[in-house]
A protein has these predicted regions:
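Alpha-helical transmembrane-bundle signature of multi-pass membrane transport and export proteins
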Residues: 1-159
Length: 159
């Protein structure tokens, strides 16, 4: 019996989508934080807004997991990616050049809320996309993508 492949079409599509989504969010969130720092000159405001924007992900990820268990995960991920895109377009059109700190904070919190549901949906999808004997490797790939975006996203956002 031949060994199953880790990088099936569906797993590859999900992973590429995750890379694009997570890198985009990490770059954007860090760049917005730097924008706040440039506007205010205050490291305290910079850190406060960045910390506040992480709270929804920390608190609501378990609820995102429940939602991912009860709804079609692929649909959740697609809806959330389009929601992120819509939020970016609205923010850019209305507030990007205004220097409105409340709008920046709200936008960053919205991105964090989306992430609180998106990431559990990705993780819950893995067992349905790969064979059981490849599950550990597939989970490793997903976690590696998360780690790399967390590390490299801010670097790219600072450029």
């Amino acid at each position: 019996m031949p060994a199953s492949r880790l990088f099936t079409r569906d797993f590859t599509l999900m992973t590429v989508g995750q890379i694009i989504s997570l890198f985009g969010n990490a770059i954007l969130r860090f760049a917005l934080s730097l924008h706040v720092l440039a506007l205010t000159g205050s490291a305290a405001v910079f850190g406060g807004i960045l910390a506040l924007s992480m709270v929804p992900t920390a608190l609501l990820s378990p609820l995102g997991g429940i939602l991912a268990d009860r709804m079609p995960r692929a649909r959740i991920m697609v809806i959330l990616d389009f929601s992120t895109c819509a939020c970016i377009l609205v923010f850019d059109a209305l507030f990007a050049r205004s220097g409105n700190l409340a709008a920046v904070t709200l936008f960053m919190v919205l991105l964090s809320l989306i992430q609180a549901v998106y990431q559990p949906s990705v993780q819950a999808s893995v067992p349905t996309l790969v064979a059981e004997e490849r599950l550990t490797a597939a989970n490793g790939v997903v976690l590696q993508v998360q780690a790399l975006t967390g590390l490299l996203g801010p670097v790219l956002g600072g450029i």
